């Protein structure tokens, strides 16, 4: 049975170069042929945050490319196109995810079963610097990605402490380890 919709692979191949030119990559494509109208969701991510203007521009370009399909690939009927960022519910699973989450608060589950909450710092050679609360100040703990079982960005409703954010933005992994800064 044909759905009249392109496959996930076809959408990625069709849109990938345009998204890359804008500085974003397609993380996932979800096609729901059972929805009415059918839905094509394109999840994009990049080093720069995906703002509303960029989403609108990417959506317009994606729509034009998808509507321009012809022959056997032509989309039959109406469909709903969604272009969005991965959102906070997406687990961080690769170096690029941690690099893009720098400065964000995350909760980690480690391979030994322990949990840590901290702010993502520098990502280097398979190791992430995590700024954690220690006594009355902040410390940087280096954690190999291989030891992280699960990592999820936490939603924050108040700004971080300046010293915490400064450590997370520091580009010298290891220099700040064990140092204390005022809360």
Curated annotation (Swiss-Prot):
Entry superkingdom: Bacteria
Main location: cytoplasm
An example Gene Ontology biological process: translation
UniProt KW keywords: Cytoplasm, Ribosome biogenesis
One cellular component (GO) term of this entry: cytosol
Locations listed in the record: Cytoplasm
One Pfam match: DUF150_C
CDD domains membership: YlxS_C
Gene3D superfamilies: RimP-like superfamily, N-terminal
Recorded family membership: Belongs to the RimP family.
NCBIfam families in UniProt: PRK00092.2-2 (NF000930)
Function: Required for maturation of 30S ribosomal subunits.
Extra remark beyond the main annotation: Was identified as a high-confidence drug target.
Official protein name in the record: Ribosome maturation factor RimP
The species this protein was found in: Mycobacterium tuberculosis (strain ATCC 25618 / H37Rv)
């Amino acid at each position: 049975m044909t759905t009249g919709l392109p496959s996930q692979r076809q959408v990625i191949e069709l849109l990938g170069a345009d998204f890359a030119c804008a500085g974003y990559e397609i993380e996932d494509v979800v096609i729901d042929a059972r929805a009415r109208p059918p839905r094509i969701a394109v999840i994009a991510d990049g080093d720069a945050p995906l703002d509303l203007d960029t989403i609108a521009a990417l959506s317009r370009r994606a729509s034009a490319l998808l509507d321009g399909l012809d022959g056997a690939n032509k989309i039959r009927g109406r469909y709903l196109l969604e272009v969005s960022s991965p959102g906070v519910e997406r687990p961080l699973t690769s170096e690029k995810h941690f690099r893009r989450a720098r400065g964000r608060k995350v909760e980690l589950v480690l391979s030994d079963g322990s949990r840590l909450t901290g702010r993502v710092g520098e990502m280097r050679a398979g190791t992430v610097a995590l700024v954690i609360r220690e006594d009355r100040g902040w410390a940087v703990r280096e954690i190999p990605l291989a030891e992280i079982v699960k990592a999820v960005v936490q939603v924050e409703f108040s700004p971080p402490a300046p010293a915490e954010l400064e450590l997370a933005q520091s580009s010298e992994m290891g220099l700040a380890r064990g140092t204390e800064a005022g809360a």
